Amino acid sequence: ESFLAELRQVVGHDLDFEIDQYSPPLEARAEGGLYDVIVAVMQRHDPAAPVVPSLSTGGTDAKHIVPRRPGTQVYGFMPYRQQPGLEEMQLIHGHDERTSVDELLFATRVLYDVVINYTNSTETQ
């Protein structure tokens, strides 16, 4: 409802909106804890790669986690670097979905380091 109110401020009240499906929104903090670990790990692996919060308009498995564990911070983190000239974003969920071996190895190293660093940071708290 707050989103609709904000949307009406932008586009006016002359349009009608119909919500076909609704589930409570999920929001994760873009600071502290796991988020800071993700930023630090990405800075080590690729200092030029920004970590940017985004809004996902699709579904997410997080909707099954957060209701069972309120307060859980869930991030759809994908350590992925777009290769120049390659239309990889069009391949996501496509019939010919794929990624390069280099990107798979990069993502594996980054995710491994995120898990190790986050685990180590929570053990010292």
What feature does the model see in each segment?
Residues 1-125:
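Metal-dependent amide/peptide-bond hydrolase catalytic core
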